[in-house]
Amino acid sequence: MKEAAPVEGAKATESIDALKVRIRELEKEVDRWKSQVKSVRYGLCWQDVPEAFDKDSEDKIPVLEEVSEKAIDAAGPLAGRPPHVIIEGDNYHALTCLNYTHRGKIDVIYIDPPYNTGSDGFTYKDRRFLTEFPDGQKVPREHPLRHSYWLSFMEKRLKLAKNLLSDRGVIFISIDDNEQANLKLLCDKIFGEGNLLTTFPRKGTGGRQDSKYFAIVHEYIQGYAKRLDKFESGRMAKGKNFPLFDESKNLHYKTQLLRKWGDNSRRENRPNLFYPIYYNTSTKEFSLSKSKNFLEIYPMLDLNNEGCWRWGKKTMEEAFHKGLVEIQKNRKGEWIPYERIYDNPNEESTKPYSSWIDDIDNSTGSSLLKEILQTHDFSYPKPVDLIDRIIRMSSMQKSTVILDFFAGSGTTLHATLNLNKEDGGNRRCILVQQSEGENNICECVTYERNRRVMCGYTSAKGERVEGLGGSLKYYKTGFVGKHPSKNASDADKVELAEKAGCLIALAENTLETVALPKAASGFFQIYSDNAEKKRYTCIYHNGDYERVPEFIDRIDELRKNDKRAKFAVYVFSWNSPDFFENEFDDLTNIEIKAIPKPILEIYKALNG
């Protein structure tokens, strides 16, 4: 018993020391919070929860690695165009890599992040509880940190995304009521309140009954410009804002709900606007008088709540006679009256409208995906027409670069391919998607959907659909070194230089690998684009310079084959590439750059 006392005393001392350490940590946390609260004068304030990542990626340097067997080069109308890109991996790491390859180069970003409904599977890895939840926690609706987790998750990614936008660039974010208000304030903070484009209400996955009082049928798209003074909105062509066609009038038109919505839309608000209209499904006639074989239709908000029409009886009667009313049957079999709004035939195009509440139903995204993949194991894919509209109104240019870093089913690339085919454009699309689920979503849905669109497929109905053609490169995020970028050792820098080939090729938009002897590939790599006027990216990544003469000879050989070709030459150097400049005195159209220092400098800046 006497011998045990010192042991117990030592244990008590250890516990006290651990408690002191924990107290100091909590004091630092309190000080950090006090500082944050003092700095906020107006706007959004939440508990910024530190995020953890997979163990293999912690404290390492992110790179991209090509999966060459997934490359696509398909014949068809879009063959020979610049390649598109899919990146498989956590979008935080992918965005970090893109901050080197595409800073200031992206014209349009569209994302469809988790809505944080409490049941959509949103998972957050709270660094403080990794031992308890190593794979992260699904965030239920009643979780006390539900909104803080989501805001912490989104803020990091949106800050990285902002760096990628060109001066004329724009970002559009799909969201619903769960986080729309928070997202608006977060984007005001990141992009600037003065760069708000608008909040677009749009038709969502209709008729959700999870709300106690209303059947929720709307969502939002939050839009911001990098610099509003540089933004040029594309105008919508006929058939886009007015997607329907009336052969009798030879005019395009769109429809708008005849029942009033929003404020003052209930019967008690406007009793004089609550009355029946009558419709004959055989003759397509309308009437305000009860007649045989005519349906009686009231402006119902839902089965038990009475609404009101937008027009009084006189205006309604006039609209009947002018052919400005039509009836559509919804998925529940209910007959719903709509106003027809006709296009102005004297205008070739029009400004985009800020409300998309009456068109582009989400259900079309599900049906199309099922047609292509012949299976449907993906919830709420966005419709192609929605992304088409966003791209069109984001720019009048046909060579924009588009990014979606919550790619999901890959709709954004599909829409880009369709639009390029329609107008002969050279738009390029980059998709980023995590490898979620037992069946890797990125491989089995994002990639496979677009592989079929490019190469052709047999639909669920057994019909052959010809491919659009085009090319695509597939990458995965990878990691090098044993330290984060700010503490990179010499060994880390050597490994980064050796593994940075795909990053550099993507930055230069030269994604085709030039074949080299196996022995040479351990020292240098060469990439090219697929354009008629060639550009080459040549990378000498080894610290041993014994093969530099062979490297130079290879470049000279390519230059002689095409004297118009341009070359970007990257060389491993601890500081600057001055050592190599004399070696290239006799060669023209060559720019020499050092690696890996510029990559590390960008990564360090991102991590503070």
What residue ranges belong to the model's regions?
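DnaQ-like (DEDDh/DEDDy) 3′-5′ exonuclease domain used for proofreading
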Residues: M1-Y110, Y115-K156, S576
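Active-site-adjacent helix-turn-beta-strand microarchitecture at beta-sheet edges
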Residues: L19, E25-W33, T205, R227-E371
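Phosphate/ATP-binding catalytic cores across multiple sugar-kinase/actin-like superfamilies
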Residues: A94, L98-T101, M154-L158, L164-L165, ...
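SAM-dependent methyltransferase catalytic-core segment centered on the flexible catalytic loop
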Residues: G76-P77, Y92, T101-V170, N178, ...
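Signature of N6-adenine DNA methyltransferases within the class I
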Residues: M154, D167-R168, D177-F242
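Conserved S-adenosyl-L-methionine
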Residues: W46, F53, D135, L151, ...
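Active-site-adjacent "gating/activation" loops or surface patches in catalytic cores
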Residues: I86, T117-F133, P345-K382
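PRPP-dependent phosphoribosyltransferase catalytic core
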Residues: N418, E422-G608
